[in-house]
């Protein structure tokens, strides 16, 4: 985000109840009333952003549609801040105006955060909130605190302290896709980025070793780590891994195309099938990965 100078992560929570709520006629009114409990405001903001995309098959129009909705949300947050600062007679520094919860008709629940942990906490909270809202209206009304009281809670220093606002790690908010990540240089690279707070998407063909190393990394580091078993010479598998990457983290910042091997043999003895296999892994796979990453960079405008 150019406005906040912060790298943001996006998390999509696959949940039929959330999808049904986001697509319902009641969502426009019910979702804008407030939080289930006052302290949720520091994790979810006071209201979610609602999206009902009209241009799903046109990426440029969809980008403009989402950008317009975000600008409207941020403007409303600025007004919320100014109104409550004036009415409460307090001197506060405005927090970032981005939503934490996005409800997308036909899709469901998307969350935004500075770390994987933040996005997952926000998703957990709002999944429960949806249930509370529905049950409340089934038996009566849902009447949370008004905006002025939520403002007091959101800007209360003791509540903000819960977020643990320490200096961000060097690579916090960065999403790094690494191939050949189960051993050697790939694993060492993963550890280095994890030490610096990056979110990792680790890829390897060796399922057992990859799972084992991911478990070790998750115990050692607090950052978000996802993995996918992929044959990088298979274009369809690479494309599926990028789809999973987007669902998990929302995008990509860095690609480390590391997977490869060195086939040895005398020039007159190495058969053509072995050479072709070597080129598939050591040349064409890197082109496939780079192509997928560049397409995503272009969509992200990064």
Q: PLM features: residue spans?
A:
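Conserved glycine-rich Rossmann-like NAD(P)H-binding loop of the short-chain dehydrogenase/reductase
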Residues: 198-212
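A short, exposed helix-loop element centered on a Lys and neighboring polar residues
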Residues: 290-291
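A glycine-rich helix->loop->beta "capping" turn
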Residues: 221-224, 244-255, 263
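Substrate-binding pocket helix/loop in short-chain dehydrogenase/reductase
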Residues: 266-267, 271-279
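Canonical Rossmann dinucleotide-binding motif of NAD(H)/NADP(H)-dependent dehydrogenases/reductases
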Residues: 174-201
């Amino acid at each position: 985000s150019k406005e906040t100078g912060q790298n943001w992560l996006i998390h999509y929570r696959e949940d039929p109840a959330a999808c049904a709520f986001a697509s319902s006629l009641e969502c426009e009114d019910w979702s804008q009333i407030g939080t289930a409990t006052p302290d949720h405001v520091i994790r979810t903001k006071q209201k979610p952003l609602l999206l009902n995309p009209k241009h799903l098959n046109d990426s440029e129009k969809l980008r403009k549609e989402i950008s317009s909705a975000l600008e409207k949300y941020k403007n409303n947050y600025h007004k919320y801040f100014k109104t409550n600062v004036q009415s409460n007679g307090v001197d506060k520094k405005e927090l970032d105006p981005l939503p934490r919860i996005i409800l997308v008709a036909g899709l469901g629940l998307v969350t935004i955060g500075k770390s994987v942990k933040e996005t997952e906490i926000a998703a957990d909270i709002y999944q429960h909130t949806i249930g509370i809202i529905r049950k409340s209206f089934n038996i009566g009304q849902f009447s949370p605190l008004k905006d002025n009281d939520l403002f007091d809670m959101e800007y209360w220093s003791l509540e903000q302290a819960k977020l643990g606002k320490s200096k961000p790690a060097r690579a916090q908010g960065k999403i790094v896709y690494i191939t050949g990540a189960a051993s050697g240089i790939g694993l060492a690279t993963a550890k280095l980025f994890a030490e610096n707070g990056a979110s990792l998407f680790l890829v390897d063909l060796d399922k057992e070793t990859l799972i084992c190393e991911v478990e070790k990394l998750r115990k050692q580091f607090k950052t978000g780590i996802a993995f996918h078993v992929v044959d990088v010479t298979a274009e369809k598998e690479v494309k599926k891994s990028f789809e999973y990457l987007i669902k998990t983290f929302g995008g990509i910042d860095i690609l480390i195309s590391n997977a490869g091997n060195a086939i040895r043999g005398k020039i007159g003895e190495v058969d053509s099938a072995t050479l072709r296999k070597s080129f598939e892994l050591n040349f064409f796979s890197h082109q496939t990965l780079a192509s997928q990453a560049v397409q995503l960079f272009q969509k992200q405008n990064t």
